[in-house]
């Protein structure tokens, strides 16, 4: 396979809608029911910040290998050693495990030249599946977004750039409740359709807790563009394991936890959240299981879990949903 375009100028014109990437399965190709009848699932990892965090990530990766996820994704750590560690660990996941690996790529604070270089690094590691995002300002997701003077303004532009660089499968983000920077849901849906028309093959949602928001998103995309509306929208969820993780969940979802769910967690916590932490965790697992089951019932193409580099809570939810674990990691 030629990598000639990866670090050079992009190929003009619209990329083909169904890229042929020799030797690298696409995410869409993985979205078929498993032999046991369950729908595909996938997991998200975060770049490890130090050696201890990296060891924890690898333990989680080996645990998930035993459940045969359709793919794993690695979020993007921008800048300095975090960026370098992200690229290295993402490449190792692709080379040293059986896990189909998706690398996140964000436009924020990068020039086009830097973005091309990052894509080239992933290509050199054999990674041909990218999740393309505009990204939030580091340190303040709600802060003012500023385009790099030599960078890109919109995720749609980044999709076109990546597709013009060579053989890549591209996914994008979608937002069941709308992105906080979008003026309204109709405009937000139009942005998603533009990213799909630019060459994205699927989207992964921002985390949410109300399945109806996901269903309404699907309907909006079909109404916006019936052709692009046929592309998979993979829902993202995260088990809440303590009251402390509620704040993290709200940051990731961009919305407050629904009152009915918060009440269930607070009831389990009682007057002593620390003493009742196991009860709170059990309710969090129960809530994630309920959300996952409804998504399955509503025909979701897969389930994508935020793991924070821990396997236990997600594997418990998956077990509740009927997924099985093999005796040993498949690449051990």
Where are these regions (language model features)?
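Active-site mouth loops of central-metabolism enzymes
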Residues: 40-56, 101-113, 169-187, 266-286
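N-terminal amphipathic alpha-helix/helix-capping segment at the start of soluble metabolic enzymes
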Residues: 2-43, 50, 55, 327-332
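Catalytic domains of carbohydrate-active enzymes, especially glycoside hydrolases
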Residues: 59-75, 197
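Active-site beta-loop-alpha junctions enriched in small/polar residues
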Residues: 45-48, 75-79, 104-110, 135-137, ...
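Conserved, mostly hydrophobic/aromatic
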Residues: 44, 72, 122, 195, ...
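Active-site pocket-lining/capping segments in soluble small-molecule metabolic enzymes
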Residues: 19-31, 149-175, 225-291, 321-332
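Active-site-adjacent beta->alpha loops and helix N-cap segments on the catalytic face
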Residues: 24-25, 53-54, 80-92, 111-118, ...
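Short, acidic/polar
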Residues: 51-64, 86, 112-119, 184-194, ...
């Amino acid at each position: 396979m030629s990598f000639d375009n990866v670090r050079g100028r992009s190929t003009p014109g619209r990329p083909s809608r169904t890229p042929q990437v020799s030797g690298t399965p696409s995410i869409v190709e993985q979205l078929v029911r498993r032999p046991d009848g369950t729908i595909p699932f996938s997991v998200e990892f975060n770049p490890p910040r130090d050696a201890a965090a990296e060891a924890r990530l690898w333990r989680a990766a080996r645990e998930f290998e035993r459940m045969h996820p359709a793919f794993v994704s690695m979020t993007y750590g921008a800048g300095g050693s975090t960026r370098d560690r992200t690229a290295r660990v993402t490449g190792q996941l692709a080379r040293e495990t059986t896990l189909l690996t998706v690398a996140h790529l964000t436009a924020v604070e990068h020039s086009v030249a830097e973005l091309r270089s990052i894509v080239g690094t992933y290509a050199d590691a054999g990674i041909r599946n990218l999740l393309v995002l505009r990204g939030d300002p580091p340190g303040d997701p709600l802060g003012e977004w500023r385009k790099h003077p030599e960078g890109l303004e919109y995720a749609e532009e980044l999709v076109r750039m990546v597709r013009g660089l060579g053989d890549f499968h591209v996914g994008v983000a979608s937002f069941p409740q709308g992105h906080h920077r979008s003026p309204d849901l109709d405009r937000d849906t139009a942005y998603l359709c533009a990213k799909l028309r630019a060459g994205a093959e699927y989207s992964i949602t921002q985390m949410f807790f109300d399945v109806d928001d996901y269903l309404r998103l699907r309907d909006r995309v079909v109404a916006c563009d019936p052709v692009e509306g046929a592309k998979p929208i993979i829902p993202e969820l995260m088990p809440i394991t303590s009251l402390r993780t509620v704040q993290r969940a709200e940051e990731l979802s961009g919305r407050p936890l629904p009152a009915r769910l918060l009440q269930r967690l607070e009831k389990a916590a009682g007057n002593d959240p620390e003493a009742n932490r196991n009860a709170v965790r059990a309710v969090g697992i129960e809530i994630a299981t309920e959300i996952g089951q409804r998504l399955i019932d509503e025909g979701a193409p897969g389930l994508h879990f935020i793991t924070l580099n821990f396997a236990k809570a997600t594997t418990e939810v998956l077990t509740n949903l009927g997924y099985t674990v093999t005796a040993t990691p498949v690449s051990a």
